[in-house]
UniProtKB/Swiss-Prot annotation:
Organism annotation: Arabidopsis thaliana
Disulfide bonds: none
GO terms assigned for molecular function: SUMO-specific endopeptidase activity
Protein name: Probable ubiquitin-like-specific protease 2A
Residues annotated as catalytic: H400, D430, C485
Pfam families the record matches: Peptidase_C48 (PF02902), PH_ULP (PF25352)
Length: 774
């Protein structure tokens, strides 16, 4: 037995080396934990650089503790950061990005290749914008040891825009790195200390769960960057980022340093304050939506657009207008063009490009060719595109609108001709240049080639010329916020149709004429289109369609003053019709809208001026530039004879005429409801920020009516001893920088002693008169 036991042990010795010991089991478990971190990204997504760092740390015995899975990007700093001057670099080399990292009191530069940047933005589940300490709550940040990384959708800084970027907030500075600059592979790297940051304005758009941020910085001009300064000494950096948890991330950034709390504001942009100051657009929309029923426009057409209540809601500030509003305005614009000129243009609706590029299937097709043509061939069955001068195509992709214009598609230009007058080309008009990459535009040449083949299959004409059409991305006015792209599309379209030449050559565009240049129009002018479209929908909803031309009329439709100047009676009737249905948008009615006996309409009608240029914004070039939205307001100015000097006649003054004051010294007339005699009210301009009017009554010189206010609003106070009249409402629209009554206020008087039925009549007859002081 002993012998057998010895033999057994001797046989087992050769295989003892294959048995697992406790130490081997421990190593195996550690290996499994490490390998889990390198699983397929489909299962778990981690930043490769961080995983390699943890892997090397473990095998270098740098730590004995179990490595925790990181959910956020954290950069540890061993010592307090030393603040150094801001620095920016713009490079045309697309091989790598440069990040300035401050450590141990000196700068170090870490190179990050484009693959790493891409993986950060596309493959990571890391919450872009949250900074954490591994041992603490995600939003309880130790500002000494953490930075906040944000992956913006787009960054705009002066004349450059970056689409593949990283933005980092730390306790002492803000860094920007990008590997895609102005749609090229150039790189951009910039750093600002927190002292360089003047203000941060953050806006949140719930509909698309995207934040839009303006960072105001102390001015400096990095090499290769042209900064347009609205205010001397201040630069503007803008970025947008999709992040459903943005509010928490803002708090995380604020927790880095108390100085962020002092400079970070949740606010609206300056352009919106200018565009909507003094007007309660929300009230207007609420009142309109309450009574709004589905609007079919144009009535009776098979492809009419149906505007619903939910579409009206999108006209509120800081919201994106949808395809319904775009298509509606395109239809309106098309109907405004005279039949003779209409044949030069062709307008596609918003669904055309979506169908052409096959956006409903996910990733857009940029090389459609025959397949793209077959998807939309029915759209042009009865239209020959090659007979048109201009073809307009609205584009929506990645929550952004832009416009494509195909010019002279049927024109064949011989190669030996220099500077031909008519050049076939494709124009791309984008209010955030670079947001829609060139690939989206490249689908049009191949589509036009297939369209040409289908139209000329029995001819020998050259069918290869369409793909060779030159594609041009224009330098145009850019939007000043991140939600007016649809309005810019419509304004581009509006102005182009109004100014489109019969013969177009992009190489002959004159910079001095501003056509299709950055100086084409003020950016704020496009933002004001939101209110103009609301006004148009209001009028159409009330049954006043300015685009309907009477069957027996050879002139333009009677929208606010468009008339034959030789026919005074027709002119008066047209103006009456317009002035009766234009209404203010302050949520209340106005005596102006109820005046049925109006016989004149001054060049600067108070109501028209108020609706057209809200907040005192009156672009100097707007009166000279004709657009297809403007006739509602501007053509009333042309229809009436302008008078620089009006005769003052108290005896002939009635409560039905309202004329804007054009001089610093003004005389107002108030008609008392108990007395037909007009009472004079003298305007006194003490300063640019305060306004007073004094009411002079013959019976008692001490009685006065005082209206005072600042640029933010005008408020009325009653100090008249007589009980014959009282102020019921003050409706203001005044430029805060003007020293005259150019945009006048309107006082509506009523008698408290009258019955409610009589008060209606009083509101019609008792109103403020305004004439220049003699």
């Amino acid at each position: 037995m002993t012998l057998r036991s010895v033999q057994s042990r001797s046989k087992r010795k050769p295989i003892d080396v294959f048995d697992y010991s406790d130490e081997d089991d421990r190593v195996e478990e550690e290996s499994k934990k490490l390998l889990r971190k390198f699983d397929s990204p489909v299962t778990k997504k981690h930043h490769c650089a961080i995983d390699k760092y943890e892997f090397l740390r473990c095998f270098a015995k740098d730590t004995q503790s179990e490595s925790k899975v990181l959910q956020h990007i954290v950069i540890d700093v061993e010592v307090p950061v030393k603040e150094e001057p801001s620095r920016c670099e713009l490079s045309g080399d697309g091989n790598s990005d440069l990040i300035d990292v401050i450590s141990n009191g000196s700068h170090r530069r870490i190179g990050i290749d484009s693959l790493t940047s891409s993986s950060l933005s596309e493959n990571d589940e890391v919450s872009t914008g949250e900074a954490t300490n591994p041992a603490s709550d995600p939003h309880e940040v130790d500002p000494e040891n953490a930075q906040v990384l944000i992956i913006p959708d787009v960054i705009i800084y002066g004349d450059i825009y970056c689409t593949n970027s990283k933005l980092t907030f730390s306790r002492n500075c803000m860094n920007v790195e990008s590997s895609s600059v102005n749609a090229t592979k150039g790189t951009f790297s910039c750093q600002w200390t927190i002292e360089d940051i003047i203000k941060i304005e953050s806006q949140w758009c719930l509909e698309v769960e995207t934040a839009f941020v303006n960072v105001l910085l102390k001015s400096r001009k990095p090499e290769g960057v042209d900064i347009a300064k609205d205010i001397s000494g201040i630069d503007l950096l803008k970025f947008s980022v999709y992040d459903p948890k943005w509010s928490k991330e803002v708090e995380t950034i604020r927790s880095l340093d108390s100085r962020y709390k002092n400079i970070w504001f949740d606010t609206i942009t300056e352009s919106e304050e200018i565009a909507f100051s003094g007007h309660d657009l929300g009230t207007s929309l609420t009142n309109l939506a309450d009574s709004f029923e589905d609007l079919v426009y144009p009535q009776g057409e098979p492809d009419a657009v149906v505007v619903r209540k939910q579409d009206i809601e999108l006209l509120k500030p800081r919201r994106f207008i949808n395809d319904t509003i775009i298509d509606f305005y395109i239809k309106y614009l098309k109907n405004r063009i005279s039949p003779k000129e209409r044949g030069r243009f062709h307008f596609f609706n918003c669904f055309f490009f979506r169908k052409l590029a096959n956006l409903d299937k996910g990733t857009p097709s940029t090389c459609g060719g025959r397949e793209a043509y077959q998807r939309v061939q029915k759209w042009t069955k009865n239209v020959d595109l090659f007979e048109k001068d201009y073809i307009f195509i609205p584009i929506n992709c990645s929550f952004h609108w832009s416009l494509v214009i195909i010019c002279h598609p049927g024109e064949l230009v011989p190669s030996h001709v220099e500077n031909p007058q008519r050049v076939p080309c494709i124009l791309h008009l984008d209010s955030i240049k670079g947001s829609h990459k060139g690939g989206l535009i490249n689908i049009f040449p191949s589509y036009l080639r297939e369209e040409w083949k289908a139209r000329h299959e029995n001819t020998t004409n050259d069918s290869s010329r369409a793909p060779n059409m030159q594609s041009i991305s224009l330098e145009l006015p850019q939007q000043e916020n991140s939600f007016d792209c649809g309005l810019f599309l419509l304004h581009y379209l509006d102005l182009f149709v109004a100014q489109a030449p019969a013969k177009f050559n992009p190489s002959l565009i004159s910079r001095s004429a501003n056509f299709l240049t950055r100086n084409w129009f003020p950016a704020k002018e496009a933002s004001l289109k939101r209110r103009n479209i609301l006004e148009l929908l209001y009028n159409l909803h009330k049954g006043h369609d300015p685009s309907i031309l009477p069957a027996n009329s050879k002139s333009e439709p009677p929208h606010c003053g468009v008339s034959n100047r030789n026919d005074q009676e027709t002119e008066s009737e047209n103006v009456i019709e317009c002035c009766n249905w234009i209404k203010p948008f302050d949520g209340s009615s106005s005596t102006v809208t109820d005046i049925s006996q109006t016989k004149t309409c001054s060049p600067d009608l108070i109501l028209s001026k108020e609706v057209s240029y809200s907040g005192g914004y009156d672009p100097p070039s707007s009166k000279l530039r004709k657009v297809f939205m403007s006739p509602i307001v501007e053509e009333v100015q042309e229809s009436c004879e302008k008078k620089d000097h009006l005769e003052m006649d108290i005896q002939k003054s009635t409560g039905h005429e309202i004329e804007t004051l054009r001089k610093e010294g003004c005389m107002l007339y108030i008609e008392d409801s108990d007395d037909e005699e007009a009472v004079s009210v003298e305007y006194v301009s003490d300063s640019q920020d305060s306004y007073e009017v004094e009411m002079k009554v013959e019976d008692d010189d001490d009685d006065e009516l005082i209206v005072t206010g600042e640029s933010s609003g005008i408020h009325g106070s009653r100090e008249i001893k007589s009980d014959s009249a009282s102020i019921e409402r003050v409706n203001k629209s005044r430029d805060s920088t003007a020293a005259s009554c150019y945009n006048d206020f309107l006082l509506v008087l009523s008698d408290d002693e009258r019955s409610s039925d009589d008060k209606e009549n009083i509101l019609i007859s008792s109103n403020v008169m305004a004439k220049p002081k003699t």
